[in-house]
């Protein structure tokens, strides 16, 4: 789930298999906390801010593909401008936020580029009065600590998404709810490469494909994954689950 909290009605329900339990790990008041439960529902609350907050970045270029954005990023770096690649909707190259971390520095950069004849870079500014805050309830206690790590004892975790795009899928490995660069959250599935390929190949080629085609697709999917682990460095994960990368649906619909 790449953009949990993009809509205030977004929900996620995580369910352990019968006879299994979920373990939730997070930090509260600088102390590690562990809870166990059969299921947990994550939801979004819009959290009012005590004072308006400026969310701003210098967008140097916009692209249809990661490859095009990466080429552009290399050109900006060659001019001495630290950058990062993002995907708020389309792919973009941003001036690195850690470096251009004040309104003055961002405006100095943009003015300098305009004086050099650049017309594409622009300042993406938004004043926020509230932000999405993910929360969950276990044993009648409400929590909103992040990141949140979720594991199951021995079985896959069932994940049901609510909101505008309801789905029900099964995932091996661990799940991690973490903030992303766009002000909402990403639910990351942490699995070994072989498990990842199980969730990709049937959905890229179809479940009725002949065995030689399945084997060839597995090689292609593995090669693609290993070559593209850097795509989402800005958000602290490696690959997305849709056609911008490879379609990945966990253990749902995998080969036996």
Predicted feature descriptions by range:
Residues 1-256:
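Conserved, single-site charged/polar hotspot
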């Amino acid at each position: 789930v790449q953009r949990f909290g993009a809509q205030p009605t977004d929900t996620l329900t995580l369910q352990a298999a019968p006879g299994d339990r979920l373990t939730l790990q997070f930090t509260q008041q600088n102390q590690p906390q562990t809870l166990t439960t059969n299921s947990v529902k994550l939801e979004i609350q819009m959290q009012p801010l005590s004072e308006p907050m400026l969310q701003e970045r210098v967008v140097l270029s916009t692209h249809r593909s990661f490859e095009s954005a990466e080429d552009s990023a290399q050109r900006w770096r060659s001019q001495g401008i630290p950058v990062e690649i993002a995907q708020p909707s389309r792919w973009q190259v941003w001036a690195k936020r850690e470096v251009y971390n004040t309104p003055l520095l961002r405006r100095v950069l943009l003015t300098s580029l305009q004086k050099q004849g650049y017309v594409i870079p622009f300042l993406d500014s938004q004043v926020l009065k509230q932000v999405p805050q993910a929360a969950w309830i276990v044993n009648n206690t409400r929590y909103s600590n992040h990141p949140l790590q979720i594991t199951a004892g021995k079985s896959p975790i069932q994940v049901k998404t609510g909101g505008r795009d309801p789905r029900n899928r099964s995932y091996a490995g661990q799940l991690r709810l973490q903030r992303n660069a766009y002000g909402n959250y990403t639910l990351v599935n942490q699995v070994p490469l072989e498990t990842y390929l199980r969730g990709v190949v049937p959905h890229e080629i179809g479940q009725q494909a002949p065995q030689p085609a399945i084997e060839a697709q597995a090689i292609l999917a593995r090669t693609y994954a290993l070559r593209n682990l850097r795509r989402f460095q800005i958000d602290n994960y490696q690959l997305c689950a849709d056609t911008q990368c490879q379609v990945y649906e966990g253990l749902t619909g995998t080969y036996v």
